[in-house]
Design a protein with these regions (language model features):
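Juxtamembrane intracellular "pre-TM" segments in multi-pass secondary transporters
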Residues: 1-2, 186-217
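Structural signature of the two symmetry-related core transmembrane helices
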Residues: 74-89, 169, 279-294
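Conserved MFS/SLC helix-loop-helix module at the cytosolic interface between two early adjacent transmembrane helices
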Residues: 58-97
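Helix-breaking motifs and short loop linkers at transmembrane-helix boundaries and internal kinks
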Residues: 37-39, 71, 92-98, 109, ...
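Cytoplasmic helix-loop-helix junction between adjacent transmembrane helices
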Residues: 102-143
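Helix-to-loop junctions at the C-terminal end of transmembrane segments
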Residues: 60-70, 263-276
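Helix-loop-helix hairpin linking two adjacent transmembrane segments in secondary transporters
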Residues: 98, 135-181
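Paired small-residue
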Residues: 82-89, 97-105, 306-312
Length: 399
């Protein structure tokens, strides 16, 4: 079994957290081909992303309280099993409607990894130390959005999109085996109350009444929604409007994702010195700057893919700072309800991302403006919410 505080455990948790970006980003180069194969519109194909986010959000409501009662490890293994079955259904889909439904169930299983990783970190760490651990996990897991679209582009070019989902089935089985053999159970004090709808709602009500929790949640959700504006629109804009091939799109998307790695690495170095809020503000500023730069690029009429990718890299660097600090700040007041706090956080965060991503997909046509405006709006919202809620967060720290 891996011991808490070791890099091996951190790497395993990073791998579990990477399920979300891996499952989303690996098939992005295939979106235009999926649309052509099923005779679907770009808006219909975007629903495979929105359905994933809705399923991801719903799963997070369930896993936290259940794991508070039954432990992290058995719940995690069950979630991975569902993920593998749904990924196989995606590969075998015969219509866009079947793919949309299968993606929702794929997310329902895949959400267990990120929810339970947050809860495991809270079992072991708290405060700035939890923020540092989540930043390190973010730095490692950031390899997923860098490598996934490149790998997805290669698979799409050589074999087609169905093989992409078969590869995810294999990755899921490998992850389940590693968890079964190496992951220790980190929950020492299990919830005494049996899991039921009233008990779950009671936990969420307690967590949701905390003003600091809501402040961190709003900041993080805004920044995360900007990411899904990019995910929803970039495949069609960069391939259909800017002329990139699937593999070239994968490389361009990966270059943007390097920004997240850089932001996570910066956060891990600075959080002990600047504190959660200092790094959070720096990240919010980067998100706003990246969004503004993307709007300026579209307004100037630039048609190079880098005119969108580089501003998004700045935005993602900000997200790499905001995401771990926002999660750690929200989770700190709830050592005895870490699972519930993580679940509610993830549900609302993913819901915001689903709405933003669907909106960009709906308005997307023969223009990059919906994409640029979606990213910029969320970037300025992130920084604005950081400024507007400083008092709430400061009072929470004093208490």
């Amino acid at each position: 079994m891996l011991r808490p505080g070791t890099f091996a455990l951190t790497a395993l948790l990073a791998g579990l957290s990477a399920v979300g970006p891996l499952t989303t980003d690996m098939y992005l180069p295939s979106l235009p081909d999926i649309a052509r194969q099923f005779g679907a519109s770009s808006a219909q194909v975007q629903l495979t992303i929105s359905a994933y986010l809705v399923g991801f959000a719903a799963g997070q409501i369930i896993y936290g309280p259940v794991s508070d009662r039954h432990g992290r490890k058995p719940v995690l293994i069950g979630a991975i099993a569902l993920y593998c079955a749904a990924s196989l259904a995606c590969a075998l889909s015969t219509s866009i409607e079947m793919l949309i439904v299968a993606r929702a169930f794929q997310a329902l299983g895949g959400s267990g990894g990120i929810v339970l990783t947050r809860a495991i970190v809270r079992d072991i760490y708290s405060g700035a130390h939890a923020g540092r651990e989540l930043s390190v996990i973010g730095s490692v897991m950031a390899l997923a959005p860098v490598l996934a679209p490149i790998l997805g582009g290669l698979i799409q070019t050589a074999f087609g999109w169905r093989v992409t989902f078969l590869a995810l089935v294999g990755a899921g089985f490998a992850g389940a085996a590693v968890v079964w053999v190496l992951l220790p159970e980190t929950l020492n004090n299990r919830a005494a109350e049996p899991v039921s709808l009233p008990s779950m709602l009671r936990s969420y009500r307690i967590v949701g009444r905390n003003p600091a929790y809501l402040a961190y949640l709003s900041i993080t959700s805004a920044s995360y929604a900007g990411l899904f504006a990019w995910i929803s629109g970039s495949a069609f804009v960069l391939q259909d409007l800017y002329g990139l091939a699937p593999f070239d799109f994968g490389v361009a998307f990966a270059l943007g994702s390097v920004g997240y790695m850089i932001g996570s690495a910066i956060a891990a170095r600075l959080v002990i010195r600047l504190g959660l809020d200092g790094v959070l503000g720096l990240g919010g500023c980067a998100c706003a700057a990246g969004g503004l730069a993307m709007v300026a690029a579209v307004a100037s009429g630039l048609t190079s893919s880098m005119s969108l990718v580089l501003p998004m890299a700045v935005y993602l660097a900000g997200l790499g700072m905001v995401l771990p600090q926002g999660i750690a700040g929200a989770m700190t007041p709830f050592p005895e309800r870490a699972g519930a706090a993580s679940s509610l956080f993830g549900f609302l965060q993913q819901t915001a991302a689903a709405v933003c991503g669907a909106a960009v997909g709906w308005f997307l046509g023969q223009s990059a403006w919906p994409l640029a405006l979606g990213v910029a709006t969320m970037g300025f919202a992130t920084f604005g919410l950081w400024l507007a809620t400083r008092g709430l967060r400061a009072r929470a720290v004093k208490h």
